[in-house]
Amino acid sequence: MTIHRPLACGILVSLLVAPAVAAGGPEVLAEAAGESWLKLVEDGQYALAWQRAAQLLKYELTQAAFVEMTKKARNETGKLVSRKLRSRKLTRQSPSGAPGRCVVIEYDSVFEKRASAVETVIMVAEPDGAWRVAGALIR
């Protein structure tokens, strides 16, 4: 039997790396989805950000209310200068108190009009398996 070393090594590496990737899975997936959503907000695409948010956020705020609040918040802070991950934590309870997977992500951020801020993004796993933003705030 002939064993092709590059193929065998590739399979072995995949088997060793896959559990490590899966171990951080929910938090990493939630963070990626949250950063995509934050990019929409940074680009001023507030209505689209609302459309791509979790049902919980949409239940709490109409699209018009979300757009108005987000514009006001961004006017107060100015444009994003930098953002660095501070923490991300997986919990088993959604912001509404209902059971469900939730990841709370915090960033140390700098804005044009605010030299130091903590952004908190609350991600929930929705029934379709996607991670979506259920809430976001800047302190």
Give each language-model segment a name:
Residues A23-G24, E35-L38, A53-K58, D108-V110:
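Second-shell loop/turn segments in exported
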Residues T2-I3, L12, V17-Q45:
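Short, low-complexity N-terminal intrinsically disordered segments enriched in polar/charged residues
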Residues V41, N75, E126-D128:
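Structural motif
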Residues E31-A32, A47-G100:
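Short solvent-exposed beta->alpha transition segments
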Residues R88-R139:
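Exposed beta-sheet edge and beta->alpha loop/turn motif
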